[in-house]
């Protein structure tokens, strides 16, 4: 350990500088780490990191931050904290959590607290809306096997679906209202097109979700059926009669 007259501290285990601390920052020489690591995905399960926090044994339902930051606007307040940590739930793998919210009081006191969840299976949960330039969903035909064209009846399915206006609440347990929305109900869609509905677990409760891609496909099929019906309505009467006669007589 080296300490300068200016108060800077350098950590140099075995004579190799690993970290430098002064009154404004902590600097870690990550290149020392990379020089001794393969950097492959396969071994990451057993690899630590230049800065490593081991929480050890914890309870079945808990959350502990790994790193946290906080700031406050001068003369205004709004003390806000952001942290990254690990959440544990009973009998399951952990979740990575990014939490953004008030550092003045708890959510029960009415202060904001957004929790973003990253699950071990790749699932991501956000408590609010997502705003993107665009969203692309994999739909390459080479990724789809056992294809079968959807049978007629899509128009009837769409007509049976009801559109509601409703208040959207945060979760099954937290009934506080997020905002007023308009849309369809997953349980209704499941009766008509079960492939469009999936079930996920949120805070210990099963919640139904809807695939917009599947709904769009159903609407496309319904429009195609409606187009055929319109064509039939526009067909002259004598043409319809000729079609029926042609089924019984060959000319």
From Swiss-Prot:
InterPro entries: S74_ICA (IPR030392). The record marks 139-140 as: Cleavage. Its main location: virion. Proteolytic cleavage and release of the chaperone in the host cytosol stabilizes the folded protein. It comes from the Viruses. Residues 139-237 form the Peptidase S74 domain. GO terms for cellular component: virus tail, fiber. Belongs to the S16-like long tail fiber protein Gp37 family. This is Long tail fiber protein Gp37. Residues 134-137 are annotated as: Interaction with the receptor-recognizing protein gp38. Homotrimer. Interacts with the receptor-recognizing protein Gp38. GO terms for biological process: symbiont entry into host cell; virion attachment to host cell. Keywords: Host-virus interaction, Viral attachment to host cell, Viral tail fiber protein, Viral tail protein, Virion, Virus entry into host cell. It is found in: Virion.
């Amino acid at each position: 350990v080296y300490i300068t007259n200016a108060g800077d501290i350098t950590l140099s285990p075995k004579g190799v500088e690993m970290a430098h601390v002064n009154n404004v920052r902590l600097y870690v020489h990550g290149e020392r780490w990379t020089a001794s690591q393969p950097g492959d995905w396969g071994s990451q399960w057993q690899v630590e990191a230049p800065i490593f926090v081991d929480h050890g044994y914890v309870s079945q339902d808990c959350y502990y931050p790994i790193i946290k930051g906080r700031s406050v606007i001068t003369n205004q307040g709004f003390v806000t904290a952001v942290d990254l940590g690990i959440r544990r739930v009973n009998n399951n793998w952990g979740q990575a959590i990014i939490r953004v919210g008030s550092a003045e009081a708890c959510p029960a006191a009415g202060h904001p607290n957004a929790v973003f969840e990253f699950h071990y299976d790749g699932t991501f949960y956000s408590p609010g809306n997502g705003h993107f330039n665009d969203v692309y969903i994999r739909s390459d035909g080479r990724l789809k096997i056992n294809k079968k064209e959807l049978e007629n009846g899509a128009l009837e399915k769409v007509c049976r679906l009801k559109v509601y206006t409703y208040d959207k609440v945060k979760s099954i347990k937290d009934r506080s209202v997020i905002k007023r929305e308009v849309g369809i109900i997953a349980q209704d869609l499941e009766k008509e097109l079960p492939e469009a509905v999936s079930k996920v677990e949120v805070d210990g409760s099963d919640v139904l979700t809807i695939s917009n891609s599947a709904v769009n496909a159903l609407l496309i099929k319904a429009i195609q059926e409606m187009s055929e019906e319109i064509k039939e309505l526009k067909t002259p009467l004598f043409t319809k009669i000729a079609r029926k006669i042609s089924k019984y007589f060959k000319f």
